[in-house]
Regions:
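Carbohydrate-active catalytic/glycan-binding domains of CAZyme proteins
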Residues: 1-293
């Protein structure tokens, strides 16, 4: 018998995993095991329930990191419903899945504080529209070895019109995944990284936060200075690029964000230098520097 796992579920009961007989397509019902959150009909509970707005689960195994990544959509599926993408991980397919803060979601909790928020509502100076309600995601590794995130994107002032989008995913040094700020356009991560001189300059920073709301996360201007400091009107901190690698660490206040630096083209055709990084507080930040011709 060939067996596969299926992840499914939504708001009311939560997210479950059940084995599927690949030959018949029928579920293989397990024995109930209350201590390990196994229901004889629904299968193994991974997280959620209690009418928390969690749906659209997808699990991707990444052989490079050795983790199973659980992608989820939070919020209501409308442009102003706070729809967004979150991420958990585990080294086994059936859990326990934890977020970047090391927290799981078996019990009733305020779900906005759980799960690494990969992206929500945002805009950048070069974008002609404000991007709203990303979600309904799946992820995969392509034949070229790159990881991709596929999802649907809504916009401000266009009702419920939506479009499919594909962004490249990158592994952080500590084994999490972060998405490129812009739709993929053939960009490739430079494995030996960039020098400090190449990176430093004026960036537009978007912090996706952890809220579930119609708030649009707007860019703030910051400066990545040659002396390793970060300065801005409302933010200050430090930054450091790890020599010979694509990794970057940005500290803003008490929060440390780890991620990658890459060069890519935005949706308007501008060449940019970007960073995408996550923190143990479940926030993701994007920084974009527009490169002059």
């Amino acid at each position: 018998m060939c067996i596969r796992d299926r992840v499914y579920g939504s708001w009311s009961g939560g997210i479950f995993l059940i084995e599927i007989d690949e030959e018949t397509g029928y579920p293989i019902y397990p024995e109930a095991d209350e201590e390990n959150h196994v229901d004889s009909y629904y299968g193994k509970k991974l997280l959620g329930g209690y009418h928390n707005s969690i749906e659209g689960p997808h699990i991707m195994y990444d052989e490079t990191s050795g983790y199973y990544y659980l992608f989820l959509s939070y919020g209501n599926l409308q442009a102003k419903g706070g729809y967004q993408m979150r991420l958990f991980r585990c080294d086994t397919v059936d859990g326990i899945y934890t977020d970047a803060a090391g927290k799981d979601m078996y019990l009733f909790v305020e779900h906005k504080d759980h799960g690494l928020k990969m992206m929500g509502n945002y805009t950048f100076p070069s974008l002609t529209q404000t991007y709203m309600a990303p979600g309904g995601q799946t992820a995969f590794e392509d034949e070229d070895g790159k990881l991709y995130l596929v999802y649907h994107q809504r916009f401000a002032k266009t009702g419920e019109l939506h479009e499919p989008r594909v962004h490249q995913l990158f592994r952080t040094k500590d084994g999490w995944l972060v998405a490129a700020p812009f739709a993929t356009d053939g960009e490739t991560l430079k494995e030996d990284g960039y020098s400090g001189d190449e990176i430093q300059g004026t960036f537009y920073l978007v912090n996706h936060g952890t809220d579930i709301s119609d708030k649009v996360h707007k860019p703030q201007g910051i400066q990545l200075n040659a002396d390793g400091t970060v300065t801005g009107e409302e933010l200050e901190g430090t930054w450091e690029a790890e020599e010979g690698t694509p990794y970057i660490e940005v500290t803003l206040g008490e929060n440390i964000y780890t991620g990658v630096v890459l060069a890519m083209t935005d949706e308007a055709g501008n060449d940019t230098m970007c960073f995408s990084a996550k923190s143990d507080n479940n926030e993701t930040i994007w920084g974009v520097k527009y490169l002059l011709p």
